[in-house]
Amino acid sequence: DLIFNAMAFNSACWNLARIIGPAAAGFIIAIFAGGNTTSSFGVGLVYVILSLLYFVSAVSVLFIVHPGRPTQTQKRSALKDMQEALRYVVSSPIVGGLILLSILPFLFGLSINTLLPAFSTDVLNGGPEDLGLLMTGMGFGAILGSLTLAKMSSVTKKGFWIIGTGALWGGLVAIFSTTSDYLISTIVIGFIGFVSAINMSMNRSVMQLQVAQSMRGRIMSVDMMSHGLMPLGILPIGHIAETTSVQTGLLTSGIALLLLTLLFGALMPQVRKINLGYK
């Protein structure tokens, strides 16, 4: 319960920042640019503030004191630790399957974040304000999804939930690509935020429950490192969007996420059998 609630709270805070951050940045730029659309001072100031916030965040972590219960007594090189983590992932069908299912959304599901400005301009004929509202809709849906996850710690068949929300995420992206009405697009993208928050947070929560305590930090590092594969999905989807249309690019990414999630879910019975997140 504590892990699920912690992941839900972390996701809710992150998505709340997605709503507040762009609005605050736009407000700062508007004030210091003084209506000059060619001014770079306001944008530069936003990056300075962002850097300071990162610094404050890093310093704050240094003051967290928690002795924990370390289980590793030998000092080894970082390379050997990483090799052991990769062997653990390969040898565990459940952990490897969860990491694979977490990679697919980063390859295809998050393409909507990259293509959203072009979709808002080319398809919805919207301006910066419309794009901001679409992003707010996604963030608001993600917050609701995070809060919903906090109530799902006792839900059974979590493996099916992870696979199902991943497939639904892809289906919603495909549906979003066919919309041309601003209100409908906002509603659909809100559902995308809702489903994506549940999928990513539940996957990571279940993964932590499946991994041995001595390996937890290294496995989470492998999981985070795998998210760096996102450009591999954005490049072909962006090429499709450029050579055909934004709608076709989004439709392709949505269908790819839907079908690949269902395919790998069908090929990984151990993941489907995950019940309460415990072995």
Language-model segments: which ranges?
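Recurrent gating helices in multi-pass secondary carriers
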Residues: 94, 102, 106-114, 197, ...
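Juxtamembrane intracellular "pre-TM" segments in multi-pass secondary transporters
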Residues: 66-100
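Cytoplasmic helix-loop-helix junction between adjacent transmembrane helices
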Residues: 1-16
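Glycine/proline-centered helix-kink
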Residues: 15-30, 114, 146, 230-238
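C-terminal transmembrane bundle of multi-pass solute transporters/carriers
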Residues: 47, 51, 55, 83, ...
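Helix-loop-helix hairpin linking two adjacent transmembrane segments in secondary transporters
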Residues: 15-60
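Coil-to-alpha-helix initiation sites in intrinsically disordered, low-complexity, charged segments
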Residues: 7, 11, 73-81, 214
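Residue-level signature of transmembrane alpha-helical cores of multipass secondary-active transporters
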Residues: 11, 18, 23-27, 101-106, ...
